[in-house]
Amino acid sequence: MPKYYCEYCDIYLTHSSPVGRRQHNQGRKHISAKIEYFQNLLREEGITPQNFLGFLGNQGYNNTLANPMMNNFMPGNYNAYMKYNPMRNYHHSNRNSNYQHSIGMHNNKYSRAGYVPPGSNKYPNNHFHNNKRINNIPKPYNNYTNKPITNSSYKNDKQDYRNNNESNDNMNSNNFSNYQVNKENANFVNKNNEQPN
């Protein structure tokens, strides 16, 4: 069985198995040799980090691997979002130029997969499933919903005074007497509820 040759490290591996290759590829020496190999290759071509995108020309604008931060959302490109969440990158055919910015998909340092910018909603609203009730049928009013209470047995006289336009000049004597009765009943109940010593 032929031995595996690593062209970055310029050695033959003693164990030519998938496990041995993976272990070698994850090693410190292999990674440093790979970095050095590509640095030498770029140096020979005269490419520096400053002119790297200019060297690619139009190829960089059509290749998400060569230019991932600038071109995540260009039409026709398959990016990391499409694999796990195909609806996130859905574009309408009649979108305007500000469509990307209106839904929060910016081409900046926050546009990488899985990163949530500070202060943003981690789970954005789903525009395709806004209807919370089936067929838009409203909830029925029953004992378990928040139906407003209209007929209460006891009304606060201050609230009545503010809300009742007919009795703005003088307080309704019935409400005032109810307040006195309720106050007396409360004292009476409190006196009866006191425990003897």
UniProtKB/Swiss-Prot annotation:
Cellular compartments annotated: Nucleus
Q: Show the GO MF annotations.
A: mRNA binding; pre-mRNA 5'-splice site binding; U1 snRNA binding; zinc ion binding
Zinc fingers (Matrin-type), renumbered ranges: 4-36
**PROSITE patterns tied to this protein:** ZF_MATRIN (PS50171)
Q: Where is the composition biased (Polar residues)?
A: 142-154
Give residue spans, biased composition: Low complexity: 128-137, 164-178
| The protein's name | U1 small nuclear ribonucleoprotein C
